[in-house]
Amino acid sequence: MEIRNLRVGSYQTNCYVVWNEKEKNCIIIDPGYTGEEILEQVRCWGKTPAAILLTHGHFDHVGGVKSIAAETGCPVYICKEDLSLDPLMTDGVIHYTHTYGEGDCLDIAGLQLKVLHTPGHTPGSVCLLCEDVMFSGDTLFAGTCGRTDLKG
């Protein structure tokens, strides 16, 4: 498994591009802010997005979803509990095609991921476990736990 980290937007949100070395397709996790720039970098690596996976629905994690999905047609996954977040926190209505929840297993682009529902930062926050790597969104911050004081 190959993992590339892009720090995007003014909050320097961690966006991850993950792929199986044997596959041309990849997954994008939390494409905040700059969809065009993220997609340009993915293409520089010779990859094609097979799906967008969201750890939660806040604007700094979903900002690039619409443009990437519109250009590639790839599906977008989010936990259903985040569909009712305040639009002020989500940059408008969240674009998605599928919902997932606790215990769901995904097989995308030669990668197997397990969804772990971790509410607190948002009602629908999830962590995504792929092999021995956990993508935690804002459930964890560097050196501390994530914030739980935000509305929604």
Report the location of each language-model feature.
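Residue-level signal for pocket-adjacent positions within structured domains
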Residues: 1, 6, 81, 95, ...
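Conserved beta-strand hairpin/beta-sheet module of binuclear metal-dependent hydrolase folds
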Residues: 1-45, 126-137, 142
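Short Gly/Pro-enriched turn/cap motifs at secondary-structure boundaries
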Residues: 6-8, 97, 117-119
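Short, basic and Ser/Thr-rich N-terminal targeting/leader segments
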Residues: 11-12, 109, 122
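Conserved S/T- and glycine-rich ATP-binding loop of Class I adenylate-forming
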Residues: 18, 55, 118
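Active-site HxH/HxHxD metal-binding segment of metal-dependent hydrolases
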Residues: 23-26, 33-112
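Metallo-beta-lactamase
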Residues: 92, 112-117, 122-152
